[in-house]
UniProtKB/Swiss-Prot annotation:
This is Dephospho-CoA kinase. GO terms for molecular function: ATP binding; dephospho-CoA kinase activity. Belongs to the CoaE family. Pathway: Cofactor biosynthesis; coenzyme A biosynthesis; CoA from (R)-pantothenate: step 5/5. GO terms for cellular component: cytoplasm. It catalyses: 3'-dephospho-CoA + ATP = ADP + CoA + H(+). The lineage of its organism: Bacteria, Pseudomonadati, Pseudomonadota, Betaproteobacteria, Neisseriales. The gene is coaE. InterPro entries: Depp_CoAkinase (IPR001977), P-loop_NTPase (IPR027417). Keywords: ATP-binding, Coenzyme A biosynthesis, Cytoplasm, Kinase, Nucleotide-binding, Transferase. ATP binds at G12, S13, G14, K15, S16, A17. It is found in: Cytoplasm. Its EC number is 2.7.1.24.
Amino acid sequence: MTVWVGLTGGIGSGKSAAAQCFADLGVPRIDADAAAHSLTASDGIALPEIRRLFGDTVFDTQGLLRRDILRKEVFASPSRKALLESVMLPLIFSEIKKQQETFTDAAYGIVEIPLLTEKRQFISLIRRVLTISAPLEKRIGRVMARSGLTRGEVAAVISHQASESERLLLADDVLLNDGSLKSLREKTMRLHAFYSGIFASKPTQGKHNG
């Protein structure tokens, strides 16, 4: 039976880089954001309900979702954000569960769930939580470098996410990503050895019961 570790962290913490390090070691990897993207891609099963709730203005003339328009709309309105989440979260949950069922032989796998702290229903899918942490200034710098957003825009996104202290309270394990990619790989390798050991001998190890 494959046991699942939920990998989470704030924007710019290095979640995807850490998840890729695990994948490079042969660990099964599931990405909640990738699942969400597939659900809203061309012919994605979430599109009809999104169109019904948000109208044609969030779609282009080819019927493709205008993600930038939808993102601005939900970012500016908590009620619209909740409406979108009412559509997407159950579908993402089901997609992750479906993907998990395709893995049975590995000792453990990684599920990358950025909003795990905010959306606790996903905890039922995992056994243990790994939080990727990084100093705030490093996080802001990373996001600015890759996205072109201003410092103020990045800070606004961070302010809408769970706090670092909230993520740390949920965590079984914490990986501090405050250095180079080489350092991140080394820390990931140590965690891989740890997880491989505990899940081989004690598959229920952890405070979560997914």
